[in-house]
Each structure stands twice: as structure tokens, then as C-alpha cells.
Amino acid sequence: MARIVLIEDSPTDQAVFTQWLTKAGHEVLVANNAEDGLQLVREHGPQLVLMDVVLPGMSGFQATRALNRDEATKGIPVIIVSTKAMDTDKAWGLRQGASDYMVKPPREEELIARINELVT
């Protein structure tokens, strides 16, 4: 079981991802924006961050970059899950330090498999 911080502003996506992750045996901490998410990461030291890109305030790209520049959090894998489906968006997310990039809506089995690969 891994502790995962979910940074997602959509209540629907929060509910779906939380259900999938808890069903897979993971503990989920949810933040509605990047600033709160970064605080959760610093306070709880998760094994993984699941991050949207389009968020109020700081974007998921900016938050991913911030996590990777901070000595205390730079080793934590980040999976970006976003509606931004262009190859340039994916490449940019990976350049910011994301471990993986998935387009919404992801398939449950694939998302859980990618998470489990990074946290085991």
C-alpha cells in the first residue's frame, strides 16, 4: 500500500481516482489546487503524486517542477493525468520532471498498473 497525494480540482475526478486507488489498497490524500498539494506532499511524504495540469493558481506543470527542484521531494514520482493530449504537452510535462503522463480519462487498470510500477 502506498500513500498517494492526488492534486485534482474536479470533484468528479477526485471521487473516481480516490475510489480506484483505495480499491487497489492505496491511501489517498486529496488537494484541490497545487499549493495545497505541495503542502500535503511536504507534510506527509507520499510515495507518489497524481497531478492534474489545469488547476486554479499554479499549474500542474509548475507544481511538478517545484517538487523536482526541492531536495526533500525531488525523488517522489509524479504521474500527470490531464486532458491536455498534445504530444508537446506530454513532452513538456516530462521535461518538468514527471515520471509518466496519461491523458484523461485513463483506464483504471492502466492507471493502477503504472502507479504500482512506480511505488513497488
Annotate each PLM feature.
Residues H44-L50, L55:
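Active-site beta3 strand of CheY-like receiver
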Residues P106-N116:
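C-terminal output helix
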